[in-house]
Amino acid sequence: MSDLNKLGLAEARDLLRKGDTTSVELTEACLKAIDGADALNAFVHKTPDVALDRAKAADARIAEGDAPAMCGLPIGMKDLFCTKGVDSQAASNILKGFKPEYESTVSQKLQDAGAVMLGKLNMDEFAMGSSNETSAYGNAISPWRREGDETPLTPGGSSGGSAAAVAADLCLAATGTDTGGSIRQPAAFTGTVGIKPTYGRCSRWGIVAFASSLDQAGPMTKNVRDAAIMLEAMCGHDAKDSTSVDLAVPNFEAMLTGDIKGKKIGIPREYRMDGMPAEIAKLWDEGAAMLKAAGAEIVDISLPHTKYALPAYYVIAPAEASSNLARYDGVRYGHRATLAQGDGITEMYEKTRAEGFGHEVQRRVMVGTYVLSAGFYDAYYNRARKVRTLIKKDFEDVFAAGVDAILTPATPSAAFGLGEMNDEDPVKMYLNDVFTVTVNLAGLPGISVPTGVDTQGLPLGLQLIGRPWDEGDLLNTAYALEQAAGFVAKPAQWW
């Protein structure tokens, strides 16, 4: 069977169980696709030997009849996850050559479930970015192009390599992480599905930290069913992460009935921003109409503190980043600068960080250090934390009033061209996160579902936000939206 790499997780799982294909065949198809897609710069560390060894082991396990759902399925791993003996550098020069001695909990769970790791995926450096342009590996490039235009487009960020790889059928699915929208925005830009689960649902242990109170891992897949299958394998309690919650993990796939009759879907009026492109507003209205036609009740809701979310996020996230990134000092691991005669420890720190950190990371570390400094701690950091509490309360009030899920746009536009925002004020790039950061600040689950295309043929996504710990219900609502939207567009192969 040709084109095995074009399958989704559920389809491939069913073929494996029937004996119609093998994990080795699936893996070889993906490895061939990866080797033919260097122009996308999605896979930055290829691990064909690891992949084929795991595929052979998975085939043996399937033959014995004790295989979990993910067994034998080839996936990509975002470079933010530590993978034992395999380069894990968070797309930063400061971690060049770093091969961890341990495996992150999420990647270990996937490995234990029999998933096959094809390699590590490009991303924004330390997950700081919305376009995959801050990577030490160079830009990841979207497989999508505007109709009649060869301008290379961003796959989004920070999980840009994951989104590009899934959209281009280089793997069946991929892991991502989401601190302010880094799963959902790239998914929307590439016509894929991305879910950020409730904060604490997936362990953060072994994931290189950006902002510890916001970071959360999740799957990036070709459809909602695949997201349900992969999320179940990724989450679960981990004693090594103090924020990991000890809750039973439901069978998310079994909850996908598509029945949303009587569900209350909230439409937040504050998300209708000035200058919102007509295409995004129209898509949002169409999405609400689709859910209504499926039997849901659409209600107008208010999230009054929404306008403060972006500034609060861009105080809290850099503050936590400046603390987390203090560990990269050239002493224990990663890059160490060459020192001049007479240089001491201070010069080693300065030179190592100047050489190792890219501009955006340096900017965020500086902002974070500033807002945590003695004179500004109360004015910025403490105030942002108070705003965060109010944003969380807004959502709690809406859910307490009986709303089951909230529908919003995922992004303020379709994918933009690489370099298009480079000369701009960085705040313009930060505005890409305007619809997604509230979900991280409130610790809620959010999913991006491809729902349509713009006038130039580029994919557009809508976001659904769910109650905490209710990913099953959220996935089912997303499944109903996916069925109604009937999105099947794929990028035309140019690479």
Curated annotation (Swiss-Prot):
InterPro entries: Amidase, Amidase_CS, Amidase_dom, AS_sf, GatA
Task performed by this protein: Allows the formation of correctly charged Gln-tRNA(Gln) through the transamidation of misacylated Glu-tRNA(Gln) in organisms which lack glutaminyl-tRNA synthetase. The reaction takes place in the presence of glutamine and ATP through an activated gamma-phospho-Glu-tRNA(Gln).
Gene Ontology CC, one term: glutamyl-tRNA(Gln) amidotransferase complex
GO molecular function per UniProt: ATP binding; glutaminyl-tRNA synthase (glutamine-hydrolyzing) activity
Pfam families hit by this protein: Amidase (PF01425)
Subunit record text: Heterotrimer of A, B and C subunits.
BP GO annotations: translation
Originating organism: Ruegeria sp. (strain TM1040)
Annotated catalysed reactions: L-glutamyl-tRNA(Gln) + L-glutamine + ATP + H2O = L-glutaminyl-tRNA(Gln) + L-glutamate + ADP + phosphate + H(+)
Keywords from the UniProt entry: ATP-binding, Ligase, Nucleotide-binding, Protein biosynthesis
Highest taxon listed in the record's lineage: Bacteria
Catalytic-site annotation from UniProt: K78 (charge relay system), S158 (charge relay system), S182 (acyl-ester intermediate)
Entry protein name: Glutamyl-tRNA(Gln) amidotransferase subunit A
UniProt EC number: 6.3.5.7
Class of this enzyme: ligase
Lineage, highest ranks first: Bacteria, Pseudomonadati, Pseudomonadota, Alphaproteobacteria, Rhodobacterales
Underlying gene: gatA
Family: Belongs to the amidase family. GatA subfamily.
